[in-house]
Amino acid sequence: MISLPLLLFVLLFSALLLCPSSSDDDGDAAGDELALLSFKSSLLYQGGQSLASWNTSGHGQHCTWVGVVCGRRRRRHPHRVVKLLLRSSNLSGIISPSLGNLSFLRELDLGDNYLSGEIPPELSRLSRLQLLELSDNSIQGSIPAAIGACTKLTSLDLSHNQLRGMIPREIGASLKHLSNLYLYKNGLSGEIPSALGNLTSLQEFDLSFNRLSGAIPSSLGQLSSLLTMNLGQNNLSGMIPNSIWNLSSLRAFSVRENKLGGMIPTNAFKTLHLLEVIDMGTNRFHGKIPASVANASHLTVIQIYGNLFSGIITSGFGRLRNLTELYLWRNLFQTREQDDWGFISDLTNCSKLQTLNLGENNLGGVLPNSFSNLSTSLSFLALELNKITGSIPKDIGNLIGLQHLYLCNNNFRGSLPSSLGRLKNLGILLAYENNLSGSIPLAIGNLTELNILLLGTNKFSGWIPYTLSNLTNLLSLGLSTNNLSGPIPSELFNIQTLSIMINVSKNNLEGSIPQEIGHLKNLVEFHAESNRLSGKIPNTLGDCQLLRYLYLQNNLLSGSIPSALGQLKGLETLDLSSNNLSGQIPTSLADITMLHSLNLSFNSFVGEVPTIGAFAAASGISIQGNAKLCGGIPDLHLPRCCPLLENRKHFPVLPISVSLAAALAILSSLYLLITWHKRTKKGAPSRTSMKGHPLVSYSQLVKATDGFAPTNLLGSGSFGSVYKGKLNIQDHVAVKVLKLENPKALKSFTAECEALRNMRHRNLVKIVTICSSIDNRGNDFKAIVYDFMPNGSLEDWIHPETNDQADQRHLNLHRRVTILLDVACALDYLHRHGPEPVVHCDIKSSNVLLDSDMVAHVGDFGLARILVDGTSLIQQSTSSMGFIGTIGYAAPEYGVGLIASTHGDIYSYGILVLEIVTGKRPTDSTFRPDLGLRQYVELGLHGRVTDVVDTKLILDSENWLNSTNNSPCRRITECIVWLLRLGLSCSQELPSSRTPTGDIIDELNAIKQNLSGLFPVCEGGSLEF
């Protein structure tokens, strides 16, 4: 027998042989720590505080770092990293190959960051990896085939990146345990590998929003555990394989927006008992919907719109008691006989139905009364673009849950049912282009949630009902092309929300345009053409500061064009033709830079036609039928304007000369008397100067600017003109002279003085002095004198007017980031660190000025607001100045009248960031109507980023590409992507979601640090701007 001591010795020795030494484990753990630190060093931006804890070292200290999870202490390898979870940590840079050394890693989640570069093939060494989550980044390149080596993967999410190339077949051949595969929103191409049919454990499968082509492999029918399959938004063709219809476990199936065709098999839904959602929209399917659809009793959403389905709509839908949404629009369904509408009676059994879209088919005949018996949960009912006749069911008001009702483009006749007034939740009512008649029911005024009401192109008669003034949420009103008469109700213009459109054109309306129209400060379109309107064009139209389209032609309007229309800086189209207007064309119209279509023809205008602005190109204006006009550009072929006394030989010269001399003498005496009276009344110039800014006299400014000579004019706006001048021998200054004839200019002057009274910051334009006096004609005179900025505005550098300027003015990426940092520091001071919080309200490239050292200074505080507790406006003198900011830069909440806040400045700053990176103005003429600068950049980030970046910055990167080392090029590209994402983050629609100034400064400093050394000092020691 073996003695007990000997037995214990053998057991202890065996244990020592089997267990690794602690020093070995410590060495492996140290390797994990090094791999993590290498990953951190590869990042351009480390997420602010996200990786702040990653700076301690020692035995197992890395296990305490944020996002790092190590094995349990009781296990054999307690300090080995098993999870790295850094989702939504604001990380930017590349994924370091060193992560492939974390050999015990089971979960890697880097989703929702700003990572770029390619997926390192070294990740294939992670043999224990079960979850790989890299979604919502900017990762490029292809999916490495080596990923197939991670054979224990159960979830692979690479969605929402910029991946290209084909899907590796190795995913299907090797990853047998995969249950979730998400590759959507990339740029993947080629065919779907048939090997993916081997993933028999797959439950979630999403390849949508790619460029995949070819047929759907029949092998996908082998995915017996599949719950969700999404192949939508690709270029797939052919038919849906029959094997797919046998996936009895399937709960959601989408192939929308492809090029698929063929018919749905008769027994397609026979085994799909668990199917809840099917989306086959926008393809080329044809034939009938099989009655077997009733077998899929769990169906809640059916989307088969945008195909070529035809015949009678099956009654099988009515047996789907869980159905909530049914989209059949844009097909070839028809109702030849009244019985063909029987499916509506069947659908009354679907008590959960919320959406029914039958628009754009060949449905005809009269609507059955059973429509009024559909579910009261129905919120969306669309019947537009069919051939439906007869009356609208009188009890349609029973559908009390309706929020959207589309009846337009049919042949409905009769009157609008008064029961519509019971639809208290209705937000959109479209009934235009029918044959409806009678009066518009007063009950429409009960629809207080209504946003859009379009009843145009019918046969309505009578007056516009005054009850429309109850629609306090209305955004758009269309009543055109009817037989309406009477005046336009003034109450209509008390609906402050009306902003998209008012169209009352082509009726028989009479009377004048109410002065109250000026209340609609956010209105974009006003159509009142082809009526019998008379009287003058109201001056108050100038208060509609967002107006872009104004149509008043073919009326009986008289008087002159109010100069206040020149305040509509966003106006694009103005048509006043065929009226009885007279007088001179106001020069203020020439100041509307956006105006590209101006029709003043067939009126009685006289005098000289301007030659600048909208009048500088004959293609955009029409003035025929005005016999007494003269001047203008040569292309208009108008007679030359004659001097007043050119034909003096026809008049008795001596009597007129004596009379004129006497009159001038009298006027001169009166003028001197009035001037003396004003001076004695007002005394010396006002001493209400800003604290610390002594006043300067009018005569000093006249001398400083050479009498405000045109050669010293730097620019002009609606509130004032800016001149270059010298107050003493050495100091150049910029003198802003207020146009006090504009009533808002004085408010601008007051706002600017109040905002900058106690402000001191290196990135704010400094006020040298002010002038509040009278000029040499005895009129009030106000001016603000600033430090002169010799390098002009940022706008001049980003958008040079000539090629010569473009060659001379080039800002490289480092300089652009520095300027953005300067502006961010200015905003941070205004919002958080000044004597009192100030909102600038007009951040844009033309208000960012550059000094001789290219340091940026924020200027023009004419719209600024001072806040109490950061939110409440106390600068009431500017509250009546109308729309806040500049179109394109102004925050969306300002468009609906919300109060100014620091969030609005952040939005404008975000747009400025996008402008400075793309070189595009926010209102660039190349943008489609539905595409703004934000959407333009978002498309670029989901495609080729270089397509949206300023070409000059691309050239900077290409200079590095020509070198032997392309690492700087990659760093530049990553910083550009980072900047674009920052701009999008700052300009989010929800104000509270926008990035605060402190975080902006942190990110810009990090970007600037990563760019350091890439843009060296040029010869002579001057920076390459």
Swiss-Prot record:
The modification Phosphoserine is found at S686, S689. InterPro entries: Kinase-like_dom_sf (IPR011009), Leu-rich_rpt (IPR001611), Leu-rich_rpt_typical-subtyp (IPR003591), LRR_dom_sf (IPR032675), LRR_N_plant-typ (IPR013210), Plant_RL_S/T_kinase (IPR051716), Prot_kinase_dom (IPR000719), Protein_kinase_ATP_BS (IPR017441). Residues 1-23 form the signal peptide. The chain crosses the membrane at residues 654-674. Residues 708-979 form the Protein kinase domain. Residues 24-653 are extracellular. ATP binds at L714, G715, S716, G717, S718, F719, G720, S721, V722, K736. It comes from the Eukaryota. Its cofactor is Mn(2+); Mg(2+). The active site is at D842 (proton acceptor). GO terms for biological process: defense response; positive regulation of defense response; positive regulation of defense response to bacterium; protein autophosphorylation. GO terms for cellular component: endoplasmic reticulum membrane; nucleus; plasma membrane. It catalyses: L-seryl-[protein] + ATP = O-phospho-L-seryl-[protein] + ADP + H(+); L-threonyl-[protein] + ATP = O-phospho-L-threonyl-[protein] + ADP + H(+). Residues 675-1025 are cytoplasmic. Its EC number is 2.7.11.1. The modification Phosphothreonine is found at T688, T705. Pfam families: LRR_1, LRR_8, LRRNT_2, Pkinase. Changing T705 to A/E: Abolished autophosphorylation and loss of interactions with target proteins (e.g. WRKY62/XB10, XB3, XB15 and XB24). Loss of positive impact on innate immunity toward X.oryzae pv. oryzae (Xoo). Enzymatic activity is fifteen time stronger with Mn(2+) than with Mg(2+). GO terms for molecular function: ATP binding; protein serine kinase activity; protein serine/threonine kinase activity. LRR repeats lie at residues 78-101, 102-126, 127-150, 152-174, 176-199, 200-223, 224-247, 248-271, 273-296, 298-319, 320-343, 350-373, 375-399, 400-423, 425-447, 448-470, 471-495, 497-520, 521-544, 545-568, 569-592, 594-617. Binds to XB3, XB15 and XB24. Receptor kinase-like protein Xa21, processed: Interacts with WRKY62/XB10 in the nucleus. Belongs to the protein kinase superfamily. Ser/Thr protein kinase family. This is Receptor kinase-like protein Xa21. It comes from Oryza sativa subsp. indica. The lineage of its organism: Eukaryota, Viridiplantae, Streptophyta, Embryophyta, Tracheophyta.
